[in-house]
Amino acid sequence: MILEHVLVLSAYLFLIGLYGLITSRNMVRALMCLELILNAVNMNFVTFSDFFDNSELKGDIFCIFVIAIAAAEAAIGLAIVSSIYRNRKSTRINQSTLLNK
């Protein structure tokens, strides 16, 4: 693939995720948008690693590291969301005042 096409696609994914993260009022949707942002960043890591340094796997290894961190973040985030839903019966961000007390 051409470098510019992949970078434009990654920028679109990043901007869609950022827009969703800013405008989202649902915690699960916000987590999904955060994962979309991380996938756009991973796409850039793999693209630049392949384009600039074809023999090294530094970008690919860093991408696997980010995927592992994102999986842990998603698991912890969903556990927190399910706990808040169990206690508050809502997953709306603006209704959750659990951390303010």
Curated annotation (Swiss-Prot):
GO molecular function: oxidoreductase activity, acting on NAD(P)H, quinone or similar compound as acceptor; quinone binding
EC class name: translocase
Topology of the protein relative to the lipid bilayer: Multi-pass membrane protein
Primary residence: plastid
Gene3D superfamilies xref list: 1.10.287.3510
GO cellular component, one term: chloroplast thylakoid membrane
A GO BP entry: ATP synthesis coupled electron transport
Subunit structure: NDH is composed of at least 16 different subunits, 5 of which are encoded in the nucleus.
Protein name per UniProt: NAD(P)H-quinone oxidoreductase subunit 4L, chloroplastic
Protein species of origin: Crucihimalaya wallichii (Rock-cress)
